[in-house]
Regions:
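Residue-level signature of tetratricopeptide-repeat
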Residues: 324-326
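Flexible, acidic/Gly-rich N-terminal and inter-domain linker regions that tether
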Residues: 1-58, 339-341, 347-363
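Conserved, mostly hydrophobic/aromatic
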Residues: 47, 60, 99, 156, ...
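Canonical Radical SAM [4Fe-4S] cluster-binding loop centered on the CxxxCxxC motif
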Residues: 49-79
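Conserved alpha-helical substructure of the radical SAM core
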Residues: 67-99
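Conserved AdoMet/S-adenosylmethionine-binding subsite of the radical SAM
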Residues: 82, 105-267
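Long, highly charged, low-complexity intrinsically disordered interaction regions
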Residues: 238-309, 338-363
Length: 363
């Protein structure tokens, strides 16, 4: 099998790992697998996302690479993937590498090959850009440390919000030891780009389960991002007949995550709009505003913390309103980046407003 054939197989196999919200990941169709435009923090980065090896001894019931699943097997040698990546950097303007692997044999053996590949890219090919290194569950501390010295960001996929659900998904991963312990190691190593993780969203968990774990990860481990992957059944896996998770659920989890990370909302506030542990179908910020606003907020008297709780006003717009000393009319709010239609039922300007809370369709 030549390198191009491997790239198609291993690049396609790497699509299940997130390097950004799925709605912000766009695969580049160029006949070569694994190249994505990933958008994060208002910037777009072209990433080569691939596995080193798609053979795996783990038994994850949702994964096409799991032991026992039939597939086209392929693996890179370290020099091979480093050389391919160098070619992509020089010819396709790829700016970063996202490297993961199946666990063929044991985690340390697989990780050693990944480290060697990144080391070659850094030394022989003098790549100084972004590397996201996927830490495999069960990897030894010494190898995690070595990988951290070559990487900008690292991640271990927790996949589930707690150990009981993990047991339903995989019989060979110890949630506390193989996963959470590795996350603690990464946290203490202090990477410039920090660490992230991913959870699979399916019917085994509620939104309350998921957000409770995300909140813990942000608070205790100082994670930069938690990514949410709506479950998609894969043919040939034990869960192939389970129903897919609606993307609307994934999106509402992202909305709620942003509220906790960027807007200062507390987890317990989100609990207030849940029904049997599930978020409403509408935007959670809008649902919270409907539940908590008992009077309109005057834009010229409000603090930054109050402004960002108004639907249609984000952190950037709120900061601009404060810096400008307020606004005089709705058209000015629009020019500053506010979504006037959504915000207007909840606001007034200098004590004046044009509508009641129920007068507008703000969905």
């Amino acid at each position: 099998m030549n390198t191009l054939e491997k790239a198609r197989i291993l690049g396609d196999a790497g699509r299940y790992d997130s390097c950004g919200p799925k709605a912000c990941e766009v695969k580049v169709e160029n006949g070569l697998g694994g190249i994505y435009h990933a958008k994060a923090e208002h910037k777009t980065c072209r990433i080569f996302k691939t596995l080193m090896d798609n053979s795996c001894s783990f038994d994850c019931r949702y994964c096409s690479n799991a032991a026992g699943c039939s597939k086209n097997k392929a693996s890179y040698e370290p020099e091979e993937v480093a050389g391919l990546f160098d070619y992509l950097v020089k010819n396709l303007a790829v700016e970063g590498l996202f490297l993961s692997s199946g666990v063929s044999g044991n985690p340390d053996k697989a990780t050693e090959k990944m480290i060697e590949a990144v080391k070659i890219a850094r030394t022989k090919y003098r790549f100084r850009g972004y590397v996201h290194f996927k830490v495999l569950p069960g990897t030894s501390y010494e190898l995690v440390k070595q990988a951290s010295e070559l990487s900008n960001r690292m991640s271990v996929n927790i996949e589930a919000p707690n150990s009981s659900i993990m047991q339903e998904l995989s019989g060979c991963k110890d949630y506390s030891i193989d996963i959470l312990r590795r996350q603690r190691w990464i946290s203490k190593l202090g990477l410039g780009g920090g660490q992230s993780t991913q959870m699979i969203i399916n019917d085994m968990s509620t939104d309350k389960d998921v957000l409770k774990m995300s909140d813990w990860e942000y608070e205790k481990l100082d994670l930069r991002r938690v990514y949410y992957a709506a479950f998609r059944p894969v043919k040939g896996t034990p869960l192939e007949n389970e129903k897919a998770t609606p993307l609307t659920r994934q999106n509402r989890l992202y909305n709620s995550d942003f509220l906790m990370r960027d807007y200062g909302y507390k987890l317990k506030e989100l609990y207030e709009i849940m029904d049997e542990g599930m978020l409403p179908r509408e935007d959670p910020k809008l649902a919270l505003a409907k539940a908590t606003f008992d009077r309109p907020l005057d834009l010229n008297e409000a603090s930054y913390e109050e402004l960002i709780r108004v639907p249609g006003i984000g952190p950037k717009t709120a900061k601009t309103i404060i810096l400008n000393g307020g606004v005089k009319k709705y058209e000015e709010l629009h020019k500053l980046g506010g979504w006037v239609k959504r915000a207007r039922p909840f606001i007034e300007i200098n004590g004046k407003r044009q509508s009641m809370l129920g007068d507008f369709d703000v969905a």
